């Protein structure tokens, strides 16, 4: 079950991340960003895009965030370095966006710790394997569907 938090003035976003190794994260994710890099050549922009995502969150003992560090250490020659990852974004208990990379690998990973807050944070930068498609779903409110 997904949990949603209410803040004064409205609902917070909520993320659910599912990785093919069995990892499911819901509570520790703070921010997700997606980007697509294309070539400057207009005629080939659609053929070779580089799709990336950056996930940041709190290092949590209740969820398997330590698995990100282990994933980042795998060399490119190891077939386990490629994983399927799905990110779902919810707002007001509705699925707003769902993006899946079917062959993702870690480009960069970092962890930061603070004595003042007592909480560690992680940043995971992943990219879709070259020339692989991504799946994306965008929610449309009922009044926009027709």
Regions found by a protein language model. Name each.
Residues 1-146:
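Glycine-rich, low-complexity intrinsically disordered segments
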């Amino acid at each position: 079950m997904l949990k949603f938090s209410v803040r004064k003035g409205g609902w917070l976003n909520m993320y659910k991340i599912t990785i093919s190794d069995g990892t499911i994260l819901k509570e520790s994710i703070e921010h997700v960003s997606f980007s697509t890099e294309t070539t400057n050549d207009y005629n080939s922009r659609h053929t070779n895009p580089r799709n990336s995502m950056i996930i940041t969150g709190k290092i949590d003992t209740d969820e398997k965030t330590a698995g990100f560090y282990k994933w980042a250490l795998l060399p490119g020659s190891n077939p386990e370095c490629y994983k399927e990852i799905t990110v779902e974004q919810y707002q007001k208990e509705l699925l707003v966006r769902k993006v899946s990379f079917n062959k993702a690998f870690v480009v960069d990973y970092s962890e930061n710790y603070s004595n003042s807050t007592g909480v560690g944070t992680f940043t995971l930068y992943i990219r879709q394997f070259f020339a692989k498609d991504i799946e994306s779903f965008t929610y449309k409110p009922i009044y926009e569907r027709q």
